[in-house]
């Protein structure tokens, strides 16, 4: 594409990746970055502030895109990953992990679909159950130390995921396929029906948080306007300075 078209800038550079924040991976380390600083410099100097789980899609069955159960399970997954040893991997291992990810995405619903792990070949189902089983101790701890009123939500939600791994018809993909088949419609029609349903749910949701959301939005707009007024530097000069900050 180039950087300019008809004298106007259309890209920051002529590379596929414009800045380091566009380096996409399944899970990406991030840090809140002060204005004008390079994200990679701040990340290296101050460490990881949070992680983005990039490979998680919106839940089409929820009008806000995610359920409480999913939030709890993702917490468990992150904690499980944190407490397990994670040595640096080679390029070859990275390629193998990419193959696993691709196989799960493309063949995850196929009975007997196989992947190659450090322990050898195994089915996607068995590997999923192995990982989920490894989360049980963490779920027990969270139930005992974090949950209120003696609730066992962590273990209960984990148990639900184990049930799903054993019967993929209960997975989101299984529910989606069943809905499409039962309604005898195509995927596009299904998406439109869901969008209308979700709009209806959103329109009838309690407005108790509307005021606070509006206040936050206005604060953000005011802050953006203030930054634009204070920053009078020419964009090309700013870009040259910004791109030259890699340490």
Q: At which residue positions do the language-model features occur?
A:
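C-terminal accessory/tail domains of diverse enzymes
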Residues: 1-247
């Amino acid at each position: 594409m180039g950087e300019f078209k008809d004298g106007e800038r259309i890209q920051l550079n002529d590379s596929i990746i414009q800045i380091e924040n566009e380096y996409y991976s399944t899970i990406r380390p991030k840090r809140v970055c002060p204005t004008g600083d390079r994200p990679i410099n701040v990340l290296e100097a101050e460490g990881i502030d949070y992680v983005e789980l990039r490979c998680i899609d919106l839940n089409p069955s929820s009008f806000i895109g995610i359920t409480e159960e999913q939030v709890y399970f993702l917490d468990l997954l992150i904690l499980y990953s944190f407490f397990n040893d994670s040595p640096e991997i080679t390029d070859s291992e990275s390629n193998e992990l990419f193959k696993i990810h691709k196989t799960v995405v493309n063949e995850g619903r196929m009975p007997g679909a196989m992947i190659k792990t450090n322990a050898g070949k195994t089915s996607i189902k068995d590997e999923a159950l192995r990982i989920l089983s490894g989360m049980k101790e963490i779920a027990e701890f969270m139930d005992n130390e974090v949950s209120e009123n003696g609730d066992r939500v962590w273990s209960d939600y984990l148990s639900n995921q184990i049930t799903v791994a054993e019967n993929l018809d209960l997975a989101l993909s299984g529910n989606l396929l069943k809905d499409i088949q039962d309604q005898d419609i195509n995927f596009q029609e299904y998406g439109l029906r869901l969008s209308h349903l979700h709009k209806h749910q959103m329109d009838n949701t309690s407005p108790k948080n509307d005021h606070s959301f509006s206040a936050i939005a206005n604060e953000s707009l005011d802050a953006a306007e203030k930054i634009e007024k204070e920053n009078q530097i020419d964009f090309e000069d700013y870009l040259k300075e910004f791109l030259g900050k890699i340490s």
